[in-house]
Amino acid sequence: MPKIKCLLKVEDPPNFLVLHCGGNNIPGDKGEKSVDLRLKINNTLVSFAKLLPDTVLVWSQILPCQHWRGGVDHEATDMVRKRLNSFVATALIRTGGKYIRYPEIQIDCPHLFAPDGVHLSELGNQFFLYRLQQGLQTFITKPTEKVSPKLGELGPWLCYD
């Protein structure tokens, strides 16, 4: 928040602010409960909305990992990730925000992840950047759209003639 306050002294507020969080803070290693993390995220969203009332907040989905750091229960942690994404998407859309999904990035696609199973591979990063760009372009050209891509919408690499 301090960085944004500083930038607002010399720049106009942005039209869009993309919020992309990694999964490192998903509970597991410090005993924090997922409800506590949701509360922190919600408080941050409220603060951003007050600070930037004319800026559209965009939630960029927390991506899955093949291996979560700290040796936590993978299935439980992934469920927390999905619930966090759903919670934030619902909260933002309700208040005029937007949501970007990454449907191609799935844990059962090992070629999309680096050998550590946490970070994206070059190909995974390309999918990520494509969907991020597509989402922003959609929200700029179609202001009433709230989610990108739509469920079932294929990327151009999956379209066949």
Question: Which residues does each predicted region cover?
Answer:
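Alpha-helical cap/lid subdomain in secreted, periplasmic
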Residues: K3-D161
